[in-house]
């Protein structure tokens, strides 16, 4: 059942959460050097940005591919729909021939990677919202300084709630609630621990940002992220009943595998649900296209792109377009597709960009 946060008084209690990410060493055998942006596509760039800005204090940011600039350079504002771009190279990269598009680069406090919204026009797109248990679903997890304050803002906006009972629940990672942004994209909000708040390097509502993706089979996902890309495995555990309820589930189990993106201390969670055969609604896998509202995308910095593409193809993984990188002044770009339909962009910076 989908609930809505209405303007009511809510009392919430702070519990533990992990600290914000920092740069870390890259394993010698990993082609991944970091994460530029976590991207999801939107049906309305302004509406989505205002939600994240007004709820979490997220700000516009410069594109990581914009080149050098002065410290005081302002981020590019959101382009009006009438000025949405059209570029044959982007069509080749994203398999969106004939489309127009615009992007919004954002930055959350205490987050070592960027957030990006992309919006496409003049091309068919799906608007099916994901449920947490759908293979290929994703969500952003914001661990925040003051959950009460964030929930109050969500309540004012009458935000749709996925969590059973409509309020935050106690979990091993702190009190948490799962909601939907204006597009229906999943956003989990957790209360940070006192230690995490004290250790935060920057002010702002967000203490840490994590990425969560739902997978059909954990072992298959690990073959892609750990074996092919060198993501670092940090642990696996079974979710508590409260964590199931946070995700709108009352029956079954959830196995959560926590990983780190090489090069930065950014957390990625692989979520493998096991639900009864008669569970309703049933799990519905995704076949994402870049233009689909909610389409999740990693934008990874990589080294040795040609060798990585060869290994990716040899392992039987698909590419979004023809699998040939496009060349930009910054470097080369190409999209692979993970076993559950998540779009994974490989970006190899040129020597000059490095």
What are these regions (language model features)?
Residues 41-112, 169-170, 214-267, 314, ...:
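Core segments of cupin and vicinal oxygen chelate
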Residues 86-95, 127-129, 282-285:
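ER-lumen resident redox/N-glycosylation machinery signature
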Residues 21-31, 62-64, 112-119, 141-142, ...:
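Vicinal oxygen chelate
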